[in-house]
Design a protein with these regions (language model features):
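Extracytoplasmic small-molecule ligand-binding "clamshell" domains
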Residues: 1-55, 63, 125, 189, ...
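Short loop->beta-strand "edge-of-pocket" segments that line small-molecule binding or catalytic clefts
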Residues: 2-3, 12, 90-106
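Ligand-binding cleft/hinge of the Venus flytrap
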Residues: 4-7, 19-29, 105-126, 155-159, ...
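Hydrophobic residues within well-ordered alpha-helices
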Residues: 22, 44-45, 92, 136-137, ...
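Beta->alpha turn/N-cap motifs
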Residues: 33-38, 47-59, 82, 100-104, ...
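A ligand-binding cleft/hinge motif common to bilobed small-molecule-binding domains
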Residues: 39-42, 54-64, 108-111, 135-170
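Flexible hinge/capping segments at coil-to-helix
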Residues: 69, 80-97, 187-188
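Periplasmic-binding protein-like
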Residues: 73-80, 156-195, 213-218
């Protein structure tokens, strides 16, 4: 629910609406591009993009970018098939999982950062959420992991075939990333604009429109 393209080719989602409103308040018109997420650093460095705004976690990357935010908080969670014998993170030991490449969930499952999960048999990294969901639907993996809103939407649309684990993988702060050493003033202005949007209820209204609990994420 953060950013996607609908059947009419329009960009939709929480981040799309937040970015549009924030930049409008600052006197800019937001333009959006969908990119292969693993190429984000290159595209930002070469100037093909001005910023990254797509459910992007600040934790552990504080010194890698010029940041605006945090503007939302997100849990990283795990989903499994309803008939799975996986009920807790410890049950993932020796199992196969799928994540989106270069995300916080991938870092946790690959033990690149502090991780509450045991060693898995296999971690598959995909470019898109569609590939991620298909891997679980087709039984290629035992579990998938990612941002709570994204995984919850998948589970809710799964006709009872999937469920969430109660435990969180990780709690992350979401921010807007600009290339390090550039746009510092713009990032600071954006942070102040986002704070104003939180104070006047705009962020709450937008996230609740997409089914999120504002008390947990704002």
């Amino acid at each position: 629910p953060y950013s996607s393209v609908d059947e009419n080719g329009n960009y939709v989602g929480i981040d799309i609406e937040l970015a549009t409103e924030a930049f409008n308040r600052m006197g800019y018109q937001a333009e959006f591009q969908m990119i292969p997420w693993e190429e984000k650093a290159r595209l930002l460095a070469e100037g093909s993009l001005d910023c990254l705004w797509s459910c992007f976690t600040m934790n552990g990357r504080e010194n890698d970018y010029e940041w605006a935010g945090p503007y939302l908080y997100s849990r990283q969670v795990v989903a499994v098939r309803s008939d799975s014998q996986i009920y807790a993170l410890k049950d993932l030991e020796g199992k196969r999982a799928a994540v989106q490449a270069t995300t916080r969930a991938s870092g946790v499952l690959l033990h690149e950062i502090a991780s509450p999960v045991p060693q898995l048999k296999q971690v598959n990294c995909f470019s898109t959420t569609e590939e991620l969901f298909a891997a679980l639907r087709k039984g290629y993996v035992d579990a998938i992991a990612g941002h709570e809103a994204m995984i919850t939407a998948f589970v809710k649309g799964g006709n009872g075939n999937y469920r969430l684990l109660e435990e969180s993988l990780y709690v992350s702060e979401l921010g807007v990333a600009f290339e390090k050493g550039t746009h510092r003033e713009l990032a600071e202005r954006l942070t102040e604009t986002l704070k104003a949007m939180e104070a006047d209820g705009t962020i709450t209204r937008i996230v609740e429109k997409y089914g999120l609990d504002a008390a947990k994420v704002v």
